[in-house]
Amino acid sequence: MHNEDVHPDVLTFAGNGEPTAHPHFAEIIDDTIALRDKYCPEAKVSVLSNSTFIYKQSVREALKKVDNNILKLDTVDPIYINKVDRPTGHYDVAEIINVMKSFEGKLIIQTMFMKGTSCGESVDNTSDTFVLPWLEAV
């Protein structure tokens, strides 16, 4: 691509799995930024994250280096999170929100508001019960 003068607009980390879960995520971001700067300096670097590992200092520092730090926060209700997002391992929504604040605005919050049912239970997080506390948090 580079030899043909074709360059990407954005280099995005996302997909099947959580990019920040990789044990060498910080080094991968550093290498990506170095290669981006060399071959396509106009391109942005983006990371789509479910926010699970932002409590790790190395992950936070790496995310602060990217152009688009996109972190997921569907709700502030832990019961809803466990029912719909079904995190495995450590996931404390209050801790996630506090760590999000440490980015001092250098983040994009991705949220999925939805209506419907799953396994016979409501997964509607569009009511004031869910939206107002979410607004307060963000």
Annotate each language-model stretch with its function.
Residues 1-12, 27:
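Conserved alpha-helical substructure of the radical SAM core
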Residues 21-138:
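Conserved AdoMet/S-adenosylmethionine-binding subsite of the radical SAM
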